[in-house]
Structures are given as C-alpha cells and as structure tokens.
Amino acid sequence: MTRFSGRPHGSVTAIPSKSAAHRYMICAALAQGRSVIRGLPEELPDDLTATLDCIRALGAAAVFRDDTLEITGINAKPDVLRLDCRDSGATYRLLYPVAPLIGGRAEFMLSPSLSARPMEPVTELLKSKGVAAEKLSVSGSFGPGEFPIRGDVSSQYISGLLLALSLLEGESRIRLTTPLQSKSYVELTRASLSAFGGESQWMGQDTILVKPRRLKAADVTVEGDYTHASLFLAAGAVYGPVTVTGLDPGSIQGDRAMLSILDRMGARVDMGGGSATVSPGRLRGIDVDVSDTPDLAPAIALAALAAEGSTVVKNGGRLRFKECDRISAIATELKRLGADIDEAPDGFTIRGGGKLHGAACLCHNDHRIA
C-alpha cells in the first residue's frame, strides 16, 4: 500500500474513452477499407489490447503507432476463431454475437471473474435463432428479424446486437422486454456505427430498428473519458480546485452526469473550452439514481464522505455483477476507513462528515475500486 499526503488539486488530462475506443475498433474491423482511430493512449490498457487482439483474430489487419491505430477491415473468414477476451467484458459482450457472422465457430477465452458474469440473455436469444450458443463458444449464422432481450442486465448485450445486426442483409428490430438501463452506452454504440455508415433508429421506447448498411472506413478521434475523470472531479469537490482537460462538453457519455451530481451536492462546477473545473463548496447529501450511470458509484461515494447528511445511491443493482460486487466492495472498504455506510440491494447510503482514518484496503481485482 502506498500512502499519499496533501490535498489533491491542480490539472489532469482525461484519458481516452475506452468505451468509445472499443466500439470504434470493432466498427473499423467490420468496415470496408482502412480506418484511422486517433487519440488512443500510447500504451493500450489490457482491455483495449484484448479487443485489438480479437479483431486481428477475426481477420482484420491493424497497425498501432503512437496514439493512432490503422485498421483494415476483415477480408478473411477463418473456420475457427479463438478469441482471448482476458478480463474485458466489453470485448466479450460486443463481439459475441458478431463472431458467428464472421467465422464458422468462435471459441472464447475468459478470465475467471469474467466467466462468472451472466451471459444467458444473449446465449438463449441466439439459440432461439438456431445458433449453437454456449458461454465459451458460438457457431452458426442467423438472419434478420426480431430480437427480444432484457434491457436491465447489461447494455452491452444490446450494443453487441447492434453491431451484429448491422451486418445482416435485411432490417432487424431489437425489442427490449424490460426497461433499458445505461442507455447512454447504447447511444454511444449507435453513434459509433453511424460514424462508419451504419443506421439505426428508435421506434418508440422499447424497439430499435437496425437497417442493413455496409460499413465504410472512417477517420475518427476518441474523446476524453468522463468515467475516469469522475474520480478527479470528486476530489476537486472535496479538496480542489481540480481541472480535467480533454473533455467534450457535448459528449453523449452518460457519465458526464458527474458534473451535475457534484453541482447538486454544492460543489462549484465550471465547464468550458474542453475542460471542467470543480472546486469545493459546502457539500450536502443527495439522492442519486445510478440506473443509467452505475460506473459513477465509486466517485459519488468519495464525494459523499465529505458531505453533510445522507447520500443515497439507488437503482444500481447491476453493480453487483461487475468485475466484483461493487456495492459490497465500496461498503466494505469505506468501512475500513471509518465511513458510516449501509448497503442496500441496489445501492448504499453514506452519512458523511465523519472522521476517517488510514487503513489497508483491497482492490477486489476491479479497476473501478482500485
């Protein structure tokens, strides 16, 4: 354990959005011609490396130099695909319905923690379409039609279907059988497909129409990541001021909501010129619905520790099925530091303003907790 002293303040540049990068890389692999993806980190994190390795295994050619990735779309269709997703849920869930449309049989290699996460909504759906679908393998093509699926387990299921259905020769409909959570990630997938010539549209509240479009090469730039920035913004609300540069004020990333959450809590928030600055104010506890922004829960918890009164984080039941049970992990580790926090099935309540102390904490093999 490393102990730091002092009050966090200053300026930091947002890292590139991994959510956008995953989608751009897959779209480029599925597109005709050579695409260019700019603004990536000079050293790819493990989950983006997993996606890069997998699209190469699918038959795409890729060259990475500095912060730019050049991808030439898939032009070979191997009989057997072996896709090592490591611990990347995005890689696995986005590529799972795509893979059988590329090759004869796809075999997935997953980390133990990723293997334990649910995939039944997708495997059962594909089985109903005549595909031999198991958690670690999938084979058999499928055609256009209606694809009913739950919207409250993982938005990545819907994003994977959007990518796959764009490859088919007829129109398809994704019909949500339960309310959609984390809608912004689905919108990010739709926007990524649109950048490569794909087309989809909402038909009411529960159906997405996906039109057949041959994806074309594109030149795109990955924007800054609001999810990663949320921790620095929370630090600014407590200690600050902290400025995060490289953020698009018009971004469709759902986790941009961290700015409005901190504003509601009483922090001073300024956005302009591609940067966000958060300064301390008199923080107060609030209720936060994280059904569309579950990845903000750790950062909200940090700000809540310094707020007067109770902060209630709710509608985040899916947090229990991430890389770890994040609700339990947040509660357990903050209690080690002296926090007054109670778990709920779908969130937690923090009574802030108490005195904290140092402690040895565990990361639970989860980068959001670390």
Where are these regions (language model features)?
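Short, structured segments at the rim of ligand-binding sites
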Residues: 1-370
